[in-house]
Amino acid sequence: MINGLAPNFASGVEMVEYDEVCSAYTNLLDLYHKHPDWNVLRVFFNQCIAYWKDRPIISPHGSVPMATCMPINTKLFIDSDLQIGVCEKISDKYRIGDIKTGINWEKANSIVYEYYNKRVERCRHCPSVRMCDMCLTAIEYTDEQWDILCHNEQVYTRVFMYLFCEMAERGMII
């Protein structure tokens, strides 16, 4: 079984600092600017700025958005035991049915409610809530783990916005 927190905490995760991350990404961006034909960097930076480039326009008031894999989305998969899973990257405990009986809607909804309630509690006033990639397995995190990941999500949100602006100024956005 894959750990529900893998790979996030398998080796330990520390808080990152904005200046260090921004500097590292800027160095990579400078390299990509010199070598625009390097496909790996092109794909990497397109992923970094994808939200900013194609961001959905939603009301900032009201419910807390859930920008993550949810049961009954396009990431559903079937494992070797014919169980229906939410995402191939997370724990076996997130199986929501099987091929013979279909989706267990009570279990799927229970997972979503638990995740949503935790996000409402933790994320209601977060400036990065609409850009957050916090995984569904976040319902298993301790408060300390949430604090670390939330801090890091906010740092990367700022870095990716910086990259979007920097790439736009350099004429690198297609």
Identify the function of each model-found stretch:
Residues 1-85, 90-95:
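Radical SAM enzyme [4Fe-4S]-AdoMet core and its adjacent flexible, acidic
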